[in-house]
A protein has these predicted regions:
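Structural motif
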Residues: 5, 74-76, 114-116, 161
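Short acidic, glycine-rich surface-loop motifs adjacent to enzyme active sites
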Residues: 13, 106-128
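Short, flexible/disordered intra-domain loops and linkers
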Residues: 17-23, 89-91, 128-140
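Extended active-site neighborhood of metal-dependent phosphoesterases/phosphodiesterases
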Residues: 19-110, 145-158, 173-188, 192-205, ...
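Active-site glycine-centered loops adjacent to acidic/histidine catalytic or metal-binding residues
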Residues: 10-11, 44-45, 120, 165-166
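A short C-terminal boundary segment appended to hydrolase-like catalytic domains
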Residues: 201, 206-244
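N-terminal active-site segment of His-dependent metallophosphoesterases
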Residues: 1-21
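Histidine-centered catalytic micro-motifs
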Residues: 117-123, 162-170
Length: 244
């Protein structure tokens, strides 16, 4: 089955240093160039450790700013928010630029059709228990501003589905009526007994969204996104819990 498009969610390489990363990104770009389908790229943190967005753009030969793609009955929002992990104080970790958040807010407030939002970093806030990388590094599994991202998603009046990479496992988490998907990595091995997962996914968009992951860590889900949002959560039941 020929896809309508190929979506690269980022982390095309494991970063080493600038010169090595330039070479590795070029090798990956050559492989993508052979595909007989439109390819849309998002930068992950490993693509950004030693390289700029501009360098990634030059290697891939594409623009890597935020973008909306019309898919007919649906639209694809390529939310290419900054995915660089900062390693020096005071802002260690991810830091979501306000400009990226405002762009997403404006885009979703004006959305008129069901929307797939693709990013590198997930924003559902889902549990990282059991995750090899993030159980003990949960702050690096998402943006510190993830709660604001979810508030932005709640502004939309159309069905939404969010898909991300970064956390190296297959998950579905529904928050406020919006399904959040994370896709397993092609080369990850912590869920596959030390061998590469060889994972890749197929997403079919319609009234029901069908997601399949192939390879050695298979997964399948059928989702029915809604334009309705959930009732706001209750306040704490007990004053002691509120104080805590």
């Amino acid at each position: 089955q020929k896809p309508d498009l190929v979506l690269d969610l980022g982390d095309r390489i494991s970063d080493i240093d600038t010169q090595t990363d330039l070479r590795l990104e070029g090798e990956v770009a050559d492989v993508f160039a052979r595909l007989n389908a439109p390819v849309y790229h998002i930068c992950g943190n490993h693509d950004r450790d030693h390289l700029t967005v501009a360098e990634n753009e030059e290697i891939l030969g594409v623009d890597l700013h935020n973008q909306v793609i019309d898919l007919g009955d649906w639209q694809l929002v390529l939310w290419r928010a900054d995915a660089k992990i900062h390693r020096t104080a005071p802002d260690i970790g991810f830091d979501l630029p306000e400009s990226d958040l405002l762009w997403l807010s404006h885009t979703l407030q004006h959305a008129t059709k069901p929307t797939l939002i693709a990013s590198h970093v997930p924003c559902s806030g889902h549990s990282q228990i059991g995750n090899y990388y993030f159980q003990r590094n949960e702050s690096l599994s998402t943006y510190p501003q993830a709660d604001r991202v979810r508030e932005v998603l709640a502004q939309a009046r159309v069905p939404l589905v969010c898909i991300a990479g970064h956390v190296h496992w297959n998950t579905v988490t529904t928050v406020d009526g919006t399904p959040h998907i994370t896709q397993q990595s092609l080369t990850e091995s912590f869920t596959t007994a030390g061998e590469p997962a060889r994972a890749w996914g197929m997403l079919e968009l319609g009234e029901t969204v069908h997601w399949q992951v192939f390879g050695d860590d298979p997964f399948e889900a059928r989702l029915t996104p809604s334009n309705q949002r959930w009732t706001a959560p209750l306040q704490p039941f007990l004053s002691k819990l509120a104080a805590e």
